[in-house]
Amino acid sequence: MIEQQTGSRIRVEALAVAGQEQAEHWAQRLGLPLHDAEADFALQSTDDGLQLQQLGDDAPGAVRVDFVEGAVAHRRLFGGGTGQMIAKAVGIQPGVRPSVLDATAGLGKDAFVLASLGCELSLIERQPIIAALLEDGLARGRDDRDVGSIVARMHLLTGNSIEIIRGWTAEPPQVIYLDPMFPHREKNALVKKEMRLFRPLVGDDMDAPALLEAALALATHRVVVKRPRKAPCIDGPKPGYALDGKSSRYDIYPKKALKPKAVTDDSGA
């Protein structure tokens, strides 16, 4: 059963007749009730997929993972390709598409960008509700003609990122990407609805220093930490350098240079 924070009671419900079976599946899997009149959130099964809706007055709109349409799809088509700062941060360059572990996957937006540029991605999300949204979005994306091949490069793991990284037995990723949620100081009322919706569920990643330490021990080439542009670095080792954007900053912890894979000559010459 999910350990729910104070003020974050969640129920599961179907908004379409055909979604009742799926709602029952998620309720059983997540240990959540199908009926709770006092719930603060509803995980809803709809014709368009799984979504999370905050309940009550002034609640932001529902959030779901959609790699086919909307903002994520627009970014894939018009977002700048390999010229994007995130691409530079993880080391994408001609002949280099590093394997990346996104240890704070969230809704998978950054991971999808990297997968669309040719990287193989492992994703870890520890909050079960967010992981459910991401799993549902990945399943729908795999069935889409346009993005199916991209989503096929994204492999989801659910659990505590630090524990998974420390117990990693597969080939180590070349790059580990972190975007931890830190104590909220933003005064702007136009904070993204995902942030407004998830903060009561997720809280702050107070174990970010331990996550950085684990990531530095596993990544073979670099660790990348995404931060608000004016925010302090994570406590611990200082980054080697940073890439600054208008609102975000990427702190780079280099370990080894990323180089193009050598092309072998099989011609027999």
From Swiss-Prot:
Checking InterPro entries in the record gives: 16SrRNA_methylTrfase_J (IPR007536), SAM-dependent_MTases_sf (IPR029063)
Q: Which family does it belong to?
A: Belongs to the methyltransferase superfamily. RsmJ family.
Return the SUPFAM superfamilies for the record. S-adenosyl-L-methionine-dependent methyltransferases
The EC number(s) this enzyme carries: 2.1.1.242
From the UniProt record, list the reaction(s) this protein catalyses. guanosine(1516) in 16S rRNA + S-adenosyl-L-methionine = N(2)-methylguanosine(1516) in 16S rRNA + S-adenosyl-L-homocysteine + H(+)
Q: GO molecular function: any one?
A: rRNA (guanine-N2-)-methyltransferase activity
User: What is the uppermost EC class here?
Assistant: transferase
Q: Does the keyword Nucleotide-binding apply?
A: no
Q: Which residues bind S-adenosyl-L-methionine?
A: 125-126, 179
Record's protein name: Ribosomal RNA small subunit methyltransferase J
Keywords, in A-Z order: Cytoplasm, Methyltransferase, rRNA processing, S-adenosyl-L-methionine, Transferase
UniProt keyword Transferase, yes or no = yes
Q: Where in the cell is it found?
A: Cytoplasm
A GO CC annotation recorded here is: cytoplasm
What is the native source organism of this protein? Pseudomonas savastanoi pv. phaseolicola (strain 1448A / Race 6)
